[in-house]
Amino acid sequence: MHEKSLTELRAALTARECSAVELAQLYLKRIEAANSLNAFIQVDPDLTLAQAKAADALLHTGHAGPLVGLPIAHKDVFVTKGWRSTAGSKMLSNYESPFDATVVARLQNAGMVCVGKTNMDEFAMGSSNENSYFGPVQNPWDVKAVPGGSSGGSAAAVAARLAPAATGTDTGGSIRQPASFSGITGIKPTYGRVSRYGMIAFASSLDQGGPMARSAADCATLLNAMAGFDGRDSTSLVRDDEDYTRYLGQPWKEDGAGKPLAGLRIGLPKEYFGAGLADDVRASIDAALKQYEALGATLVEVSLPKTELSIPVYYVIAPAEASSNLSRFDGVRFGHRAAEYRDLLDMYKKSRAEGFGPEVKRRILVGAYVLSHGYYDAYYLQAQKIRRIIAQDFQEAFRQCDVIMGPVAPTVAWDLGAKGDDPVQMYLADIYTLSVSLAGLPGMSVPCGFGAGANAQRPVGLQIIGNYFNEARMLQVADAFQRATDWHRKAPAGV
C-alpha cells in the first residue's frame, strides 16, 4: 500500500480496500521503523488517528473530496495547532501555536491526515538539513549522504515512503534541491500563489510553500488545495482559482501528430551547463532532454547572463530580511529564554546566543551588516537592483521558449559533514535555483537519473522553470516525462 500514489490511495479508500485509520497506522509504523533517518521532529499517533477517524466518517458519506483520508507530513516551519512548531530551532523547541498556518488548515479542511512534523534546517537556512537543532537527516538512498535542505525531512519522508506527500518551503531552492537529492518531485509555485500566513518567516520576499510528492500528478492535486488568495498574507496574489491538473495527460498542441509535446520549446540556459556541472549530473540531464525531444519538444539555447550574480545577491537580500524577521525572537513573548541573566539586555543577548544555531547567527550578522548605516546603499539597494535585472533576463529568455530546463544542482548529494566547515561551498550548491527564487518564478524538480561510480545510488533531478502563473503547464510538461519514464517510481533499497 505504501508504494501507491495519492490517486491510487484515494481509489483504495473509495473501494474500501482500507480505511483512513488503517492507512495512518501503516505510515506511523513505517515512520517508527525508519526512525534512524531522523526525518521527523514530532509524531503524535493520537492526533493523527483522531484526524483519520474523522476522515473515515466523511468517506462513509460518499461525498468526500479527492484528498480525504490521505496522509501528509508537514515541514515544521508551518505552525500547527496541537503540535509543537519548532522551525528546527532550539529557540522554538517547545513552542505550540494557537492557530494553524493557512497551508495546514487548507489541507486539513480537504481531509488530509497529518502523520507528523518533518525535520528541517533551522529557520529554513541551509542546503543539507545538517543545521537542525534536532540533528541531521539521512538520505534514504544513501544514509551517508545529505537529503538536501532546508526541506530535507519532507524529502526523506516521501522518498522512504514514510508519507505519500509532504509540505515544503522554498526560499532559494529548499523544495527543489532536496527533491533532486532525494529522488522525488517538488514544486515551488509563483511567489504569492501559496499563503505564507503561519509559515515561520525566513526571507519574506522569497519564502514560498509548495508540495513534495512522488509525481507531478500528485503535486498538482496537492497544489489545488494549497494555493489561493489569503487576505491574512499581504503578499498573497488575487487570482482566479485554478485546476492544476487540467492539462495532465493532454497534448501540448492538438495537432501534435501523436507526440504529446510537439510544439513545446524548451530553453536551455548556456550558463547552467558550464564547467561547474558534474559529468554524471550532465549525463542524466542530457538523457532527460533527449527523452523530451522524443516526446516532440524542441530544444533552444537561451542565456541568463546574471546567473553567477544570483549567489551574492541572494546572500545579501535573504540575510537582511532574516535579521529583521528573527529580531522578534527575544525570549520575552515566546521562544527560548536564558535561565540566568543580569538584566533585560543580558537576557536578550543570552537567550538569542543560546537559542540560535551557528548558521542562523551567521546570517543574522550578515543581514544586520548590510542594512546598517553606510552600507545599505552599497549592498542591499544594489542587490535589489540586480534582482530586477535577473527577473528581466528570464523574461527575455521566455520570449524564445515556453519552459526552461537544466540541472537543479551542480552535483548529486554530498556526504554528511563534507561541507559543514565551508559555508561558501554550501552556498554555491544553490547556483541554479537562487535566480528562480529571486525572480519569483515557479520552478520544480523531477527525478531523471542517478550519479555515477561511488554516487550511483544518489538521485539527479531535472529542473523545470516556468513563467509567472504557468504552474499548470509546467506540471503538464513534467507529467508527460513521467508517463514516458519510471525514474519517479524508483525507491531506495529496502523501502
Swiss-Prot record:
Keyword Transport: no
Keyword Nucleotide-binding: yes
InterPro entries: Amidase, Amidase_CS, Amidase_dom, AS_sf, GatA
Listed EC numbers: 6.3.5.7
Pfam families (UniProt xref): Amidase (PF01425)
UniProt-recorded Gene Ontology molecular function terms: ATP binding; glutaminyl-tRNA synthase (glutamine-hydrolyzing) activity
SUPFAM superfamilies (alphabetical): Amidase signature (AS) enzymes (SSF75304)
A single GO cellular-component term on record: glutamyl-tRNA(Gln) amidotransferase complex
Catalytic activity entry: L-glutamyl-tRNA(Gln) + L-glutamine + ATP + H2O = L-glutaminyl-tRNA(Gln) + L-glutamate + ADP + phosphate + H(+)
GO biological process, alphabetically ordered: translation
Family according to the record: Belongs to the amidase family. GatA subfamily.
Record note on quaternary structure: Heterotrimer of A, B and C subunits.
Function of the molecule: Allows the formation of correctly charged Gln-tRNA(Gln) through the transamidation of misacylated Glu-tRNA(Gln) in organisms which lack glutaminyl-tRNA synthetase. The reaction takes place in the presence of glutamine and ATP through an activated gamma-phospho-Glu-tRNA(Gln).
Protein name, UniProt field: Glutamyl-tRNA(Gln) amidotransferase subunit A
Native source species: Paraburkholderia xenovorans (strain LB400)
